[in-house]
Amino acid sequence: MSADQRGLAMTGSPEAVACLDRAIDHLIRFQIEVVDEAANAASDPSCVMGTLLRAYLSLMSTEDSNVKKAQDALTALSITETGLLPRERAHLDAASRWIAGDMAGAGASLDAISVEHPRDLLALAVGHQIDFFTGNARNLRDRIGRALYAWSREDPQFGFVQGMYAFGLEECNVYGRSEEIGQQAVEANADDVWGIHAVVHTYEMQGEIPEGVRFMKARKTDWATGNFLNVHNSWHYAL
């Protein structure tokens, strides 16, 4: 048994867990390197979270053709459920629900994980995307808000949690606070493309178009290339 950089226990070798840590770091940056690092983590059959991350990546693509890839990943698990830690079993339940077409149920399972393990960044990030896909504005805010107490500014990835919270605030029409938190997020990590996305939303929703254009132009090198969100953020820039 090992522990990740946020102190969460999990099965797998220290080397595989280090790969998983790097994969999650790429995930919150929307970087393509997440795919290879997740595969590296999953190459250790005992690192169940690596396999689950691969399943989540397939599911988050929202392509029907990738649902089978997610199912195949779970089918290939060589460790039985009894060999999993409770948090890992909960992730398996969430992924299985999503594969079965119950995205809301998957989101609820991930919410339960986040309540018990608020520093589970994978549960927060994947759950946040489910809230986005399903249009659950309130939980876009509250899923992250409930976990904030467990994080501090000393945590290297705290800024990315702030970026998610900023988007949740914006979707609940709390524009001033959203912009404030979002700006803190992108100041902490210039490549926080989701945080950038949150801030530009606040400008759009308040009709502050010149401010939004200036913001996106000033940070263009941070969001325009090297991430999965660049086309979406380009669309916001065009707006």
Where are these regions (language model features)?
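Hydrophobic core segments within long, regular secondary-structure runs in both alpha-
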Residues: 35-38, 71-75, 107-111, 137-148, ...
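Residues that mark the junctions of alpha-helical repeat units in TPR/alpha-solenoid scaffolds
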Residues: 15, 47, 86-87, 120, ...
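Well-ordered mid-protein domain cores that form the structural environment of catalytic cofactors
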Residues: 82-178
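Canonical tetratricopeptide repeat
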Residues: 53, 126, 164, 198-199, ...
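Long, internal scaffold/assembly segments composed of regular secondary structure
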Residues: 202-239
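Inter-helical turn/loop elements of alpha-helical hairpins
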Residues: 3, 12-13, 17, 22-46, ...
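Solenoid-like repeat scaffolds
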Residues: 39-45, 78-83, 111-118, 146-155, ...
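TPR alpha-solenoid repeat register
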Residues: 50-51, 123, 161, 195, ...
